[in-house]
Regions:
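Acidic, low-complexity, intrinsically disordered interaction modules
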Residues: 17-81
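N-terminal secretory leader/proregion of peptide precursors and effectors
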Residues: 12-15
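Short, structural beta-strand-to-alpha-helix junction motif
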Residues: 1-2
Length: 81
């Protein structure tokens, strides 16, 4: 499943974009909204609709005006030192 698959039929006020870490955890790496299957960056970054999603969760946070929230976790590409 890709980010595009998740957003093609539902609009999200806020998508938390997270990357996996080498130890198995994940970390926040950016955010965007979606409308009509398109990504709308909220932080100026560029996101790829074709990126494979490892896991996801829908949520809401009405106190922050987020009715349709989504967290996606994608594979982090890390360069070893």
């Amino acid at each position: 499943m890709t980010i595009g698959d998740l957003i093609k039929n539902k609009d999200y006020d806020y998508v938390s974009y997270r990357l996996t870490l080498p130890g198995g955890d994940d970390t926040f790496a950016g955010c965007f909204a979606s409308k009509g299957g398109e990504i709308i960056p909220l932080d100026g970054d560029i996101y790829d609709k074709d990126e494979e999603v490892i896991s996801y969760e829908e949520w809401s946070q009405p106190e922050d005006d987020i009715q349709n929230g989504l967290t996606v976790v994608v594979k982090g590409e890390w360069i070893g030192g």
